[in-house]
């Protein structure tokens, strides 16, 4: 699937890759935060010792930074997008629409949803961009 990046997203990815020595495959900029999809296996490099690289990136951008690890499957990607919530299982159902059903620990549903639904909406947008998933439902 081809992902279209805005000029701002391309610039933010360039800053990310310079600051972290990790590779980002997607970026969702917002007024107060930037969400990066990091190549699978590069999260440690992106975070840095004790979060040092993320802290430096946040200082450079003046916004909070959220990292999501890429995954080869829709199920893995949805689980990563809902992190740090404990996701036990993800099932993708394809009928008229494609829906990912994520089994999340009861005590982590608030984390998966986020303040004002921010986390779940971001996960839905990323899942749509990367795997043509129309919706994510928490179970």
Swiss-Prot record:
Give yes or no: UniProt keyword Transit peptide. no
Q: What keywords tag this UniProt record?
A: Cytoplasm, RNA-binding, Transcription, Transcription regulation, Transcription termination
Q: Which InterPro entries match?
A: KH_dom-like_a/b, KH_dom_NusA-like, KH_sf_prok-type, NusA_arc, NusA_bac
Please name the CDD domains in this protein's record: KH-II_NusA_arch_rpt1, KH-II_NusA_arch_rpt2
Every KH domain range: 31-97
Q: Where in the cell is it found?
A: Cytoplasm
Query: Which Gene3D superfamilies does the annotation name?
Result: 3.30.300.20
Q: Report one GO cellular component.
A: cytosol
According to its UniProt entry, the function of this protein is described as: Participates in transcription termination.
Q: What is this protein called?
A: Probable transcription termination protein NusA
Which organism's genome codes for this protein? Halobacterium salinarum (strain ATCC 700922 / JCM 11081 / NRC-1) (Halobacterium halobium)
Gene field: nusA
């Amino acid at each position: 699937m081809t992902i279209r990046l805005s000029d701002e997203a391309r610039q933010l990815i360039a800053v990310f890759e310079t600051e972290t020595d990790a590779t980002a495959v997607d970026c969702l900029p917002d007024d107060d935060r930037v969400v990066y999809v990091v190549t699978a296996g590069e999260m440690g490099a992106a975070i840095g010792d004790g979060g040092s690289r993320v802290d430096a990136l946040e200082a450079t951008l003046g916004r909070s930074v959220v990292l999501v690890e890429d995954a080869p499957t829709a199920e893995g990607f949805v689980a990563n997008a809902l992190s740090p919530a404990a996701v036990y299982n993800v099932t993708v159902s394809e009928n008229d629409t494609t829906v990912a059903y994520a089994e999340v620990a009861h005590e982590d549903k608030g984390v998966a949803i986020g303040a004002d639904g921010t986390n779940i909406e971001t996960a839905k947008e990323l899942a749509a961009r990367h795997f043509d998933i129309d919706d994510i439902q928490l179970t």
